[in-house]
Amino acid sequence: MTILFLTMVISYFGCMKAAPMKEANVRGQGSLAYPGVRTHGTLESVNGPKAGSRRLTSLADTFEHVIEELLDEDQKGRPNEENSKDADLYTSRVMLSSQVPLEPPLLFLLEEYKNYLDAANMSVRVRRHSDPARRGELSVCDGISEWVTAADKKTAVDMSGGTVTVLEKVPVSKGQLKQYFYETKCNPMGYTKEGCRGIDKRHWNSQCRTTQSYVRALTMDSKKRIGWRFIRIDTSCVCTLTIKRGR
């Protein structure tokens, strides 16, 4: 149901002449999980600034509504059974594919966009001009995101604290697919490797640190039992602060 809904949404925006995105490239057609979508362009680049300004409000509201429906549909479709073989399909940072995914997970992008709109809580025009890219804003910590395979991870820690082996391939009806994990971690080559950006170093010690969250993956425990388990992967780069003593 979720995959069908995704296909309808992508087709809908692909057919619109005055869409917020000029193009939507869908890659990873062999994947069983959510395809990646990259969007470019604005209304002004399609029909000119006047036409764009007239339709911007209604289209933005429509897009937000579609995002909310998509996220609600994903929540309803999450399986309740612990050992369901489809469990990984409902984790936005996990994908089964025959090749390396070329884009971030779709739900990952939609959740980021929805969170941004909720936080802004402004008119459409103000939202556009409050885009961090337009204001030259920078992140407190520099992070990098990439797809990694089970061959890269090999082992992981599950929710019980035990070490499990992450299986590289998952059997499906037509063969096998690889497990891919979309990980985010602090950039060791970034400008924030020696401290967080924008922090007053006279009063604070700061450090950018990679944090982890749980995702569903096909694994094997120490007793050779294979099953779907929650494992920890790198999911964000955050700033930690400690006050300097003696001040």
Swiss-Prot record:
Disulfide bonds join 141-208, 186-237, 196-239. InterPro entries: Brain-der_neurotrophic_factor, Cystine-knot_cytokine, Nerve_growth_factor-like, Nerve_growth_factor-rel, Nerve_growth_factor_CS. GO terms for biological process: cell surface receptor protein tyrosine kinase signaling pathway; modulation of chemical synaptic transmission; negative regulation of neuron apoptotic process; nerve development; nerve growth factor signaling pathway; neuron projection morphogenesis. Keywords: Cleavage on pair of basic residues, Disulfide bond, Glycoprotein, Growth factor, Secreted, Signal. Residues 19-128 form a propeptide. Its main location: secreted. Pfam families: NGF (PF00243). Residues 1-18 form the signal peptide. The keyword Disulfide bond applies. GO terms for molecular function: growth factor activity; nerve growth factor receptor binding. Mature BDNF is produced by proteolytic removal of the propeptide, catalyzed by a FURIN family member. In addition, the precursor form is proteolytically cleaved within the propeptide, but this is not an obligatory intermediate for the production of mature BDNF. Can be converted into mature BDNF by plasmin (PLG). Glycans are attached at residue 121. GO terms for cellular component: axon; cytoplasm; dendrite; extracellular space; perinuclear region of cytoplasm; synaptic vesicle. The record marks 57-58 as: Cleavage. It is found in: Secreted. Belongs to the NGF-beta family. Important signaling molecule that activates signaling cascades downstream of NTRK2. During development, promotes the survival and differentiation of selected neuronal populations of the peripheral and central nervous systems. Participates in axonal growth, pathfinding and in the modulation of dendritic growth and morphology. Major regulator of synaptic transmission and plasticity at adult synapses in many regions of the CNS. Monomers and homodimers. Binds to NTRK2/TRKB. Can form heterodimers with other neurotrophin family members, such as NTF3 and NTF4 (in vitro), but the physiological relevance of this is not clear. BDNF precursor form: interacts with the heterodimer formed by NGFR and SORCS2. Mature BDNF has much lower affinity for the heterodimer formed by NGFR and SORCS2. PANTHER family: BRAIN-DERIVED NEUROTROPHIC FACTOR (PTHR11589:SF3), NERVE GROWTH FACTOR NGF -RELATED (PTHR11589). This is Neurotrophic factor BDNF precursor form. It comes from Felis catus (Cat). The gene is BDNF.
